[in-house]
């Protein structure tokens, strides 16, 4: 089984930065994870023996079972060391919720480079940093700090922006729109849109893919993946950057440079993806796709 498949269907999950502190990200993530009855959850916190009545461990090395997925919610400066510990423990996938990386400047960029060096050393996959995580309603798994779970459905939604992703998720819950996957990719140090399209293209629960994109990541990988699946599964993209204000806003969110918009426009067309211009159009696309009345062919 590939690292991506293990990452998105883990049997064992460690939450590094788990806490009982009310309002803390580490508490909300743990509460969400504990609702997944089919997975073993291991809180990691060196300062306590239990978190929310679940036995806690001082470090991932102390967890008594092999960990498939680690979710990291610790301060940015601690993250390289945490990722190193995950690598030593044989963890296959890491979701870094923590913020304070390239979006804040040079110091954060250096932290990302160190994390990427460690990732390559151990061959693990990393989502984030500065991301919300992912939700797989079809599996009853919520590895984010967002409240509310959308019902299971056939639409996958992928976003770089956490704020936009959160708004879409809130709307989907209120509208009863179902998702096969919700994923917030953040800074895309490793897992990017190409990886997600590859994974979702082969995912039996997914019939269509909606994307909010600030920067494409690995353009060649994205084009290859989109061309491979766009004919079978509609790929609909909202990408800001047609106007200067949109480009600046996108850059401030995740440190992603918007790039030449005409290049993106041509690339989406060649890949067979459909570009929409406004969030309302993305909502409308979700409603149409959720109706399960896709045109033949």
Regions found by a protein language model. Give the residues of each.
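Catalytic-core regions of core metabolic enzymes
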Residues: 1-297
């Amino acid at each position: 089984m590939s690292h991506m498949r293990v990452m998105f269907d883990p049997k064992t999950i460690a939450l590094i930065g788990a806490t009982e502190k009310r309002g803390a990200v580490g508490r909300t993530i743990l509460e969400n994870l504990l609702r997944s009855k089919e997975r073993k959850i291991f809180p990691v916190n060196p300062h306590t023996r239990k978190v929310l009545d679940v036995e806690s461990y001082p470090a991932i090395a102390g967890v008594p079972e092999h960990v498939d997925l680690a979710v990291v919610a610790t301060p940015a400066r601690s993250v390289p060391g945490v990722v190193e510990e995950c690598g030593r423990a044989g963890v296959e996938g890491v979701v870094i919720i923590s913020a304070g990386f390239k979006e804040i400047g040079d110091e954060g960029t250096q932290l990302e480079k160190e994390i990427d060096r460690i990732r390559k050393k151990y061959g693990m996959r990393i989502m984030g940093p500065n991301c919300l995580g992912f939700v797989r309603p079809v599996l009853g798994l919520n590895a984010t700090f967002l409240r509310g779970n959308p019902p299971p459905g056939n639409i996958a939604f992928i976003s770089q922006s956490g704020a936009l992703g959160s708004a879409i998720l809130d709307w989907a819950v209120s509208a009863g729109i179902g998702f096969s996957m919700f994923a917030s990719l953040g800074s895309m140090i490793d897992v990017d849109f190409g990886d997600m399209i590859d994974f979702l293209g082969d995912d039996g629960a997914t019939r269509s893919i909606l994307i909010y994109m600030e920067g494409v990541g690995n353009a060649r990988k994205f084009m290859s993946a989109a061309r491979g699946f766009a004919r079978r599964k509609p790929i609909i993209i909202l990408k800001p950057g047609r106007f200067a204000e949109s480009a600046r806003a996108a850059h401030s969110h995740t440190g992603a440079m918007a790039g030449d918009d005409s290049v993106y426009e041509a690339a989406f067309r060649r890949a067979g993806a459909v570009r929409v211009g406004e969030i309302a159009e993305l909502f409308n696309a979700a409603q149409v796709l959720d109706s399960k009345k896709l045109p033949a062919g």
